Amino acid sequence: PQLMRNIADVNRQHETGRWLATNLGIETVSPPMVKKHLGVKTRPFATEEWGSVVREGAKILNENHWFPAATIIIGWPDETPEDSQATIDMMNDFRTMNFRGLVAPLLYQDFSEKNSMHFGNLNEAQFTLFWRCWENNLRVINDIIPIILRNKTYGPPMKIFMYGILKAGTWAIMRYLRGLCKDLFNGRTPDEIIEKYSRSRSVSSQKMITKKL
C-alpha cells in the first residue's frame, strides 16, 4: 500500500487529482478455481485469500488515483455456478464501494475448441457475471474520458473518436446481451436472471475488504 502512495506522490496524483490507468488480472475469486488455475499468482497470500486481496487492492488503487482495467475469465471447463457466484459477489461489492475501473469479462479459450467457452453455452450464473461486468463498465465510462483527454499521444479528433467508440460500444454490448439473454433463457430478461444471483451469496465468498495488505 505504501508503495502505491509513494508512486502517486511522485506522479503528483493526489496534488493534481490526476488518474492513471493500470492493468489488474483478477480472472476469478472462487477459492477452488484460484487454487487450481492461478497457482502462485496469489503469493505471498493463500489462494483462499485472493478475493479479499483483490477487493483491498482495488480500494488502495482507487484511493491513490489509479484506474484499473481488470480482467475476468468466464467459463472454465470445471466452473460451477457456485464458482461464478463468488465472482458475482465481488462485482456487487465493487458497486457498493463505488469502484472506479473497467472489468473486461473474457470467455475461456482452450487449445481444444470443445473445451472453449462460447456465448451460446453460458449458464445463468455465467451470464449474470458477464452482465455485472458490463454494468460496471457502463457506470464508470465517464471516468475514462479525463484519462483519454490527458493522453498526449492522440490529437483532439482521435480523442473525440475514441470517446464516441467507448460510449457507443458499451451501449451496443449491453443491447446485445439483452438479446442474448432472451435467446438463451426462453425470453427472460436480464433483470429476471440476475435477481437470483444478486440476492444470494457464495458460501465461500469473503466479506468485503477483509484482508489488510
Question: In which residue ranges do the predicted regions lie?
Answer:
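Conserved SAM/AdoMet-binding glycine-rich loop
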Residues: 1-68, 74-76
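Catalytic cores of alpha/beta
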Residues: 3-7, 77-93
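A structural motif corresponding to the C-terminal end of an alpha-helix
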Residues: 16-17, 56-68, 94-99, 134-161
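Flexible glycine/acidic-rich beta-alpha junction loops that bind and position SAM and/or redox cofactors
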Residues: 27-39, 74-82, 98-132, 145-162
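C-terminal, active-site-flanking charged/polar segments
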Residues: 50-51, 89-100, 108-110
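Long amphipathic alpha-helical scaffold regions
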Residues: 95-106, 115, 201-203, 207-213
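Radical SAM enzyme core and accessory elements
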Residues: 125-213
